[in-house]
Regions:
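Heptad-repeat alpha-helical coiled-coil signal-transmission segments
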Residues: 3-6, 10-13, 17, 24
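Metal-dependent catalytic cores of enzymes that make or break cyclic nucleotides
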Residues: 19-212
């Protein structure tokens, strides 16, 4: 086998192993979210819309693909949250909210140590998707561009998803109300560049709620 053919085979096998690893993690993430209300399609919707926004932002094809594939793992840390909190039908207490917030650090620990750009992106997303542009998020209170770019995208999409679907303690918002809220929070909760890309997709007639 020639050196070039060997290099190609090694690259192919590395990709196969990465895909196998990713599939296991995706199944774990799906298991974590399946305990919640209407959570089965949530990871797929987040992955699809995050990829579309990243593409609209003009990011490279590789980065777009990594975000699309890594985004469904954003809440993998929910696997470590007790059923008593995950399945609660009323608003969480302050103590329960503190426990729920640990899912980001749990998720980052699960994903830590990945050698590929994809898994490293997934780790950053898991840890930082609840950070907010003005620094009022968690776990580290990061602000602006200190928040990893992938997490800024997925954080906005995750918020959009949460608002447009029923939760035990509140009904879903309408699409129109949610889009208006996202627009109003440009430069507030969310990165203005991410919001701009999201609104362009909306104006272009893209189905923002599909998982396909």
């Amino acid at each position: 086998m020639s050196p070039s053919a060997l290099d190609q085979r090694v690259a192919e096998r590395t990709r196969e192993l990465e895909n196998e690893h990713l599939e296991v993690l995706q199944r774990l993430a799906a298991t974590a979210e399946f305990r919640g209300q209407e959570m089965g399609e949530h990871p797929r919707r987040v992955g699809r819309l995050s990829g579309l926004i990243a593409e609209q932002m003009g990011l490279t094809a590789e980065v777009v693909d990594n975000i699309r594939r890594a985004a469904p793992l954003h809440d993998i840390g929910l696997i470590g949250i007790p059923d008593s909190i995950m399945l609660k039908q009323t608003a969480l207490s302050e103590q329960e909210q503190r426990i729920m917030r640990t899912h980001v650090t749990i998720g980052a620990r699960i994903l830590a140590g990945g050698q590929s750009a994809l898994l490293q992106s997934a780790e950053r997303i898991a840890l930082s998707h609840h950070e907010r542009w003005t620094g009022k998020g968690y776990p580290d209170g990061l602000a602006g561009e200190r928040i990893p770019m992938e997490a800024r995208v997925v954080g906005m999409v995750d918020s959009f998803e949460a608002l447009t679907h029923d939760r035990p303690f509140r009904p879903a918002w309408s699409l129109q109300k949610t889009v208006a809220f996202i627009g109003d929070e440009s430069g507030g909760l969310f990165d203005p560049t991410v919001v701009s890309a999201f609104l362009k997709l909306r104006r272009a007639g893209v189905d923002l709620l599909s998982s396909e």
